[in-house]
């Protein structure tokens, strides 16, 4: 009896371990899926910023949205600083997902740094910065371009501000960098795109009519979409499929033109880009400026004291 109970307990432990292992695999798989979206650009474009200055994410996210960037005006070499990307988020809006259901908007961003600047390692971050970047997983755009950092998609509700920890280069070590003024370019999106890199449209688009004519019939499909039957002026019947999740703007008997939208626009997201300037400051120049300012201040102070002393002597001479 005891032997049977021991076997059963061992079997239960093995089953429990297998369940935990399976759960871990699923979590890792989902994590890989959630981080796979930036790979669209990474696989298609060697550099995400075109020669015109346009960031390639705009090729898939057609709607424009405002984004904002914050960074210090000056940084010292070999120091860690924050670059904050702000993505305005509307909590009352839902996006259409790939399966036609509605869900929260996700966000993503790419930061294009000057050559030599790169993602700061965790051992260089202070506690405050570690807390801000907790649960954020940044990736280099490619092995060659470690000055370009991508993140996303991540939940928009919790990430309206994304803090990028950046390590400034030291020109004394990296001879390709200099004490100059540089530009940081940022692109960020919220919600799904309208196109895939292949040029194929996603379901995040309004549906145009395939023909001119009269709406003969609207049939709901079992999957939740619609079949719209259009009768042309030549008495030809054309059937058009509207996928699940889209809202029709037409009704039976209505006349429409070819190319006229028969659904509302489901897109509630978009893409925006911005830039900011930053100076890599020379510490020697900064120290020299401080000493110069102090010397000027001391000189002015001595001048004032000397002037007061002179006025005092003049006053004494007049009394005699």
UniProtKB/Swiss-Prot annotation:
Annotated GO MF terms: electron transfer activity; heme binding; iron ion binding
Output the Gene3D superfamilies linked to this UniProt entry: 2.40.50.100, Cytochrome f large domain (2.60.40.830), Single helix bin (1.20.5.700)
Cofactor(s) recorded in Swiss-Prot or TrEMBL: heme
Q: Does the keyword Manganese apply?
A: no
SUPFAM superfamilies under this entry? Answer: Cytochrome f subunit of the cytochrome b6f complex, transmembrane anchor, Cytochrome f, large domain, Rudiment single hybrid motif
Pfam families in the cross-refs: Apocytochr_F_C (PF01333), Apocytochr_F_N (PF16639)
Transmembrane domains' residue ranges: 286-305
User: How the protein sits in the membrane?
Assistant: Single-pass membrane protein
Please tell me where heme binds in this chain. Answer: 37, 57, 60-61
Subcellular location(s): the record lists: Plastid, Chloroplast thylakoid membrane
Report if keyword Transmembrane is assigned: yes
Task: Classify the main location.
Answer: plastid
What InterPro entries would the database entry show? Cyt-f_TM, Cyt_f, Cyt_f_lg_dom, Cyt_f_lg_dom_sf, Rudment_hybrid_motif
In the UniProt record, the signal sequence range is 1-36
Co-factor: note = Binds 1 heme group covalently.
Q: How does it assemble?
A: The 4 large subunits of the cytochrome b6-f complex are cytochrome b6, subunit IV (17 kDa polypeptide, petD), cytochrome f and the Rieske protein, while the 4 small subunits are PetG, PetL, PetM and PetN. The complex functions as a dimer.
The family this protein is said to belong to: Belongs to the cytochrome f family.
Among PANTHER family, the record links this protein to: CYTOCHROME F (PTHR33288:SF10), PTHR33288
- According to UniProt, the name of this protein is Cytochrome f
Organism name? Cyanidium caldarium
Instruction: Point out the gene that encodes the protein.
Output: petA
């Amino acid at each position: 009896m005891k032997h049977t109970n021991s076997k059963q307990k061992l079997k239960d432990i093995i089953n429990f371990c297998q369940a935990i292992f399976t759960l871990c695999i699923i979590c890792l798989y989902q994590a890989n899926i959630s981080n796979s979206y930036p790979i669209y650009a990474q696989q298609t474009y060697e550099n995400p910023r075109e020669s015109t200055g346009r960031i390639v994410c705009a090729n898939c996210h057609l709607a424009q949205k405002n984004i904002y960037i914050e960074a210090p005006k000056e940084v010292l070499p070999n120091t860690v600083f924050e670059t904050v990307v702000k993505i305005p988020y509307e909590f009352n809006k839902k996006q259409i997902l790939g399966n036609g259901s509605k869900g929260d908007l996700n966000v993503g961003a790419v930061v294009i740094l000057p050559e030599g600047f790169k993602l700061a390692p965790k051992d260089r971050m202070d506690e405050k910065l570690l807390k801000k970047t907790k649960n954020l997983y940044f990736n280099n755009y490619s092995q060659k371009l470690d000055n370009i950092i991508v993140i996303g998609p991540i939940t928009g509700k919790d990430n309206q501000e994304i803090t990028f920890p950046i390590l400034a280069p030291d020109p004394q070590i990296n001879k390709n960098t200099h004490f100059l003024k540089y530009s940081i370019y940022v692109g960020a999106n919220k919600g799904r795109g309208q196109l895939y890199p292949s040029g194929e449209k996603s379901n995040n688009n309004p549906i145009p009519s395939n023909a001119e004519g009269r709406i003969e019939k609207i049939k709901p499909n079992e999957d939740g979409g619609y079949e719209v039957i259009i009768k042309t002026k030549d008495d030809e019947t054309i059937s058009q499929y509207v996928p699940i999740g889209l809202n029709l703007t037409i009704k039976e008997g209505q006349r429409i033109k070819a190319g006229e939208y028969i659904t509302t626009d489901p897109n509630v997201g978009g893409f925006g880009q911005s830039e900011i300037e930053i100076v890599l400051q020379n510490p020697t120049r900064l120290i020299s400026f401080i000493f110069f300012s102090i010397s000027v201040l001391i000189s002015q102070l001595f001048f004032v004291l000397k002037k007061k002393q002179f006025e005092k002597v003049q006053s004494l001479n007049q009394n005699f």
